[in-house]
């Protein structure tokens, strides 16, 4: 597996991606799914069931975000996280198009054991896509500072597993903010310096998409829902006309816009957390019978070259 640096045509493996042949050989990874559409360098959100204003053409970029599969979790509110994870994969394969790639935005596993990582790989091998990317969650780094995760999913990446790649005119940055945790997520000086150098030569009209597990904005710091040094990265991204940050971790949909930067938190495929401040903390929330899937989902994103918007569409798990 190679590391995605500046693969502008989007057809190769990328520095962190897998082609279909590698995927079948090595497997891949997964999470709660979300569909985003990039149009003209800007991300546009859509309500599920609404008409997509930018019908996809052959030059469009279409990718899927999934998050927080927590394979290995056993207990209420979801006694079968493998089943809901599998349902999300099936839903991705039934979208009616082949995604250019799928991103799992962390907490692939619950306890980061070799068996759990292997199970995620085997399940993700079902996905009909050419490339799969991941960023780690804190549950993927238990006891070994992320070593087992990097061995399974992040070979040939930089530092603790960060990387970037280009495709369809969009620049993607995948960050790791789940190591060296105290109260909040943390990037560290080496990774911040990587971002500075990575974007230095980019034109300000280049659409930017940033993946991380923990939100880069202060969603609810009391519960650890934020990144203590993210402001240094966000300040560097202010010069770009369109920046979209996609994260997991909070187990619920949430959108916030700050100037040119829009943040989208993804639904999980395992179980929801309470809304910020509604309860003692971010613990699995038990829902009434038959309501679990309403809190789970996938996300798709679409981008049309020459336009100035990313279209983000969140779908409940069916």
Feature locations, PLM:
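N-terminal export leaders
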Residues: 18-44
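Extended active-site neighborhood of metal-dependent phosphoesterases/phosphodiesterases
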Residues: 49-55, 113-207, 229-244, 256-267, ...
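N-terminal secretory signal peptides
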Residues: 1-22
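N-terminal active-site segment of His-dependent metallophosphoesterases
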Residues: 26, 42-118, 197
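Surface-exposed cleft-lining segments at the edges of enzyme active sites
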Residues: 73-75, 108-109, 178-187, 217-222
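Short, well-ordered beta-to-alpha junction loops that form the rim of enzyme active sites
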Residues: 177, 211-216, 248-250, 315
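Short acidic, glycine-rich surface-loop motifs adjacent to enzyme active sites
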Residues: 203-219
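Active-site neighborhood of phospho(di)ester-bond hydrolases with catalytic His/Asp-centered motifs
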Residues: 66-67, 102-106, 133-138, 211-212, ...
